Amino acid sequence: MITITDAAQAHFAKLLANQEPNTQIRVFVINPGTPNAECGVSYCPPDAVEPNDTEIKFEKLSAYVDDISAPFLEDAEIDFVTDQLGSQLTLKAPNAKMRKVADDAPLIERVEYVLQSQINPQLASHGGRVSLMEITEDGYAILQFGGGCNGCSMIDVTLKDGIEKELLNLFPEELKGVKDLTEHQRGDHSYY
């Protein structure tokens, strides 16, 4: 479910040494399954453990996860990285905003998952987003762009060299390509 690297475990162990005995950590998601999902880590003293919590034991500590957050923390990783600028704790939870779908789920659900978990986080850095409108019978994903992507002069590159390439790589037997449904109108909202 959650991976905590050795460096992160060592960091948490130092912090926990200054807390009351048997205090562990809690990993959680606020607003799970929504575009506003946020992940966090907090101290979890013994009296804060709930009956429906899942305990994940690591070498140097335990992490508690509530049952609502658990499916959204699938494949999450906590690391403690050090570079020239200093050190920081990182928490990557690719499924926090959308629950991971099964490999045998319908194609439309699997494509939607990739768009929400991998593509939209990249587009968000430019204030953009993409939505899956439908998948045609002949295997084309029909997409609609919004935000900073609408009217952006780089949309063809994003569509063909970015999104289409990624989706065809992931679904080679099921998709033939992607098409843009958006009526692009350049404005102040456009990224380029």
UniProtKB/Swiss-Prot annotation:
GO function terms (MF aspect): 4 iron, 4 sulfur cluster binding; iron ion binding
Entry note: cofactor: Binds 1 [4Fe-4S] cluster per subunit. The cluster is presumably bound at the interface of two monomers.
Binding site for [4Fe-4S] cluster: C149, C152
Gene Ontology biological process terms in this record: iron-sulfur cluster assembly; protein maturation
InterPro entries found in the cross-reference section: Fe/S_biogenesis_protein_NfuA, FeS_biogenesis, FSCA_dom_sf, HesB-like_dom_sf, NIF_FeS_clus_asmbl_NifU_C
NCBIfam families to which the protein is assigned, alphabetical: PRK11190.1, YhgI_GntY
HAMAP family: Fe_S_biogen_NfuA (MF_01637)
Record's protein name: Fe/S biogenesis protein NfuA
Source species: Proteus mirabilis (strain HI4320)
